[in-house]
């Protein structure tokens, strides 16, 4: 770790003194001066410093030829989405801000080509916003008074969208589906749960932290700027696959996910189930785990037979299948049962 002292150095070389004078001359320079990016570039080259750039949203289109140099783009359209709400319960609380950025994406390169539309509006929930939520997003009753979002524009933006992406989609999706049922007919992905950030050497999936990894900072907890930050984060190339994060989400949306319920698992296996990332559901008194592909599902069933059920007769598990249309929603997937005695190792 580099320790920076507030005390000035005891002596400077002639070149250092000249540089110090030049730096002092920078005081009062306007923020848009071309000198600042140059200084940031030089400081970034020093191993003891990491320079963060303020996120600047832009709607400037980029041509396909710039982005996809060797082949014609295979264009898909997506939306990154964020909400601010009056609370955590989608049944009793309301959306008071919706932010969406609609973009075009080249599935052959994993690159975002173009931002084509932006939506950010407020809505009066019809009751006072709780102080504890105002403290998070700073949206007050006065800001939303008498306002209603443009439903027609929301639905219009969704018309030709292949995928909706949210950072913690299991929170945002139930809220927006309650308010705009058209969201129910779209495929969804979650940039927290559908990307293994730890496998890629990133210790936190918090959006502000991921943005810093990408070299940017921003004022968080308002819907539109959170969307811009997420779009930048999704351009990140993941070390484990050498794919962009957004490419990983689009590809995972083409595959089913499976929730495995370890029905009647012996009590003495609870610790190894927990170590394997199974979660206990007290309402149904069962351990369960989500796996992301049919290959992983088969591996999981083999593991359960070997380490949990052994040679027990009649051992079976319940499997709930989710496509991207049901994923991260408050709806059940397609349920079936698998008799583990039929499973060949």
Please provide the spans of the model-predicted regions.
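Short linear loop/turn motifs
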Residues: 147-152, 222-229, 283-292
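Short, acidic/small-residue loops that bind anionic groups at enzyme active sites
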Residues: 185-195
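Conserved non-catalytic scaffold segment of RNase H-like nuclease domains
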Residues: 3-186, 200-217, 311-314, 322
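Acidic two-metal-ion nuclease catalytic site recognized across multiple nuclease folds
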Residues: 2-69, 236-345
């Amino acid at each position: 770790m580099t320790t920076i002292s507030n005390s000035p150095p005891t002596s400077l070389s002639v070149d250092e003194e000249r540089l110090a004078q030049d730096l002092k001359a920078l005081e009062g320079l306007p923020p848009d001066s071309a000198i600042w990016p140059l200084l940031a570039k030089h400081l970034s080259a020093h191993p003891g410093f990491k320079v963060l750039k303020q996120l600047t949203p832009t709607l400037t289109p980029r041509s396909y030829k710039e982005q996809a140099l060797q082949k014609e783009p295979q264009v898909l359209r997506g939306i990154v989405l964020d909400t601010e709400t009056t609370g955590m319960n989608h049944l009793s609380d309301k959306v008071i801000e919706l932010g969406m950025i609609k973009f075009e994406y080249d599935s052959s390169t994993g690159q975002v080509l173009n931002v084509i539309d932006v939506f950010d509006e407020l809505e009066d929930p019809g009751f006072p916003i709780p102080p504890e939520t105002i403290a998070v997003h700073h949206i007050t009753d006065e800001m939303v008074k008498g306002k209603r979002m443009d439903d027609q524009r929301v639905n219009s933006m969704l018309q030709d969208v292949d995928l909706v992406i949210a950072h913690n989609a299991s929170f945002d999706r139930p809220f927006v589906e309650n308010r705009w049922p058209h969201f129910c007919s779209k495929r969804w992905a979650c940039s927290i749960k559908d990307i293994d950030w730890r496998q890629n050497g990133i210790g936190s999936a918090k959006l502000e932290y991921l943005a810093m990894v990408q070299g940017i900072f921003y004022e968080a907890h308002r819907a539109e700027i959170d969307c811009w930050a997420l779009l930048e984060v999704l351009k990140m190339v993941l070390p484990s696959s050498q794919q962009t994060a957004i490419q990983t989400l689009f590809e995972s949306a083409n595959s089913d996910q499976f929730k495995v319920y370890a029905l009647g698992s012996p009590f003495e296996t609870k610790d190894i189930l927990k170590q394997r990332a199974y979660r206990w559901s007290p309402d149904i008194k069962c351990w369960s785990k989500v796996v992301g592909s049919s290959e992983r599902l088969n591996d999981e069933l083999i593991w359960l037979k070997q380490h949990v059920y052994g040679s027990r007769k009649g051992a079976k598990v319940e499997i709930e299948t989710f496509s991207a249309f049901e994923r991260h929603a408050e709806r059940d997937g397609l349920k079936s049962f698998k008799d583990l005695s039929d499973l060949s190792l």
